[in-house]
Regions:
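Short acidic-hydrophobic, aromatic-tinged amphipathic segments that line or gate anion-handling sites
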Residues: 76-94
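N-terminal pre-Walker A segment at the start of P-loop NTPase domains
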Residues: 1-19, 63, 73, 85
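Conserved P-loop NTPase motor cores
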Residues: 16-18, 28-50, 61-65, 87, ...
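Glycine-rich, phosphate-binding/catalytic loops in enzymes
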Residues: 74-76, 180-181
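Short, surface-exposed linear patches
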Residues: 53-54, 78-82, 185-186
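Acidic/proline-rich low-complexity IDRs
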Residues: 4-6, 68, 76, 89, ...
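AAA+/P-loop NTPase substrate/partner-engagement loops
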Residues: 52-75, 88
Length: 186
């Protein structure tokens, strides 16, 4: 019957970042179009400010000169690419996002090791069988105890944004295949 054809969505959320009510759900690709002076950048900054982004990348020839917007969004200068004709900027953003992923995977692996070590220490098994490397990796002489591994985003997947501004007519849009691929796959 009809129940055999029922669609079963995958478990978990399709949205990687928790989004406040009354805000567009993340992840998304958002295009803001308007004539010069229409307030496009201001609108994007106000939207991005209200969303839970941990790291914001920018490709724009004018963003570094707009200190107020940079400060409001807490954008790190290393995440700003000023030349929209440099197609390598997309590669640099991808490398940075991949590094965030790798850091999270490293942290999750460390947490598994840490939890296993704590379970072993608190068990009735002889402690001399524990690996010295595991013991030293998590021991803090300052705290005088074993310390849980730390992650800059608290062990969760970071929410990242890419803002491309003042790039009309640049190589970024002239060779859109790279930008399209980046947008679709990330």
């Amino acid at each position: 019957g009809a129940s055999a054809l029922a669609i079963k969505p995958p478990k978990g959320s399709a949205f990687g970042c928790p989004t406040p009510p009354m805000m567009p759900k993340l992840h998304q690709a958002c295009l803001v179009v308007g004539p010069r002076g229409a307030g496009k950048t201001t609108a994007v900054v106000n939207l991005v400010e209200r969303l839970p982004f941990d790291r914001i990348f920018v490709i724009s020839p004018s963003m570094k000169s707009n200190k107020e917007l940079m400060d409001r969004l807490k954008i790190d200068l290393q995440d700003v690419f000023e030349d929209p004709d440099d197609i390598g900027a997309l590669d640099a953003v991808k490398v940075a996002i991949d590094a965030e992923r790798d850091d999270l995977e490293r942290h999750l692996a460390e947490m598994r090791r840490y939890k296993w070590l704590m379970k072993e220490i608190n068990s009735d098994k002889p402690h001399y069988r524990l690996d010295a490397g595991d013991l030293s990796d998590f021991w803090s002489s300052r705290a005088g105890n074993f310390m849980e591994p730390k992650h800059k985003w608290g062990g969760r997947r970071p929410c990242c944004a890419l803002i491309i501004d003042d790039a009309m007519g640049s190589q970024l849009y002239s060779k859109p295949r790279r930008l399209n691929q980046f947008t679709i796959y990330h």
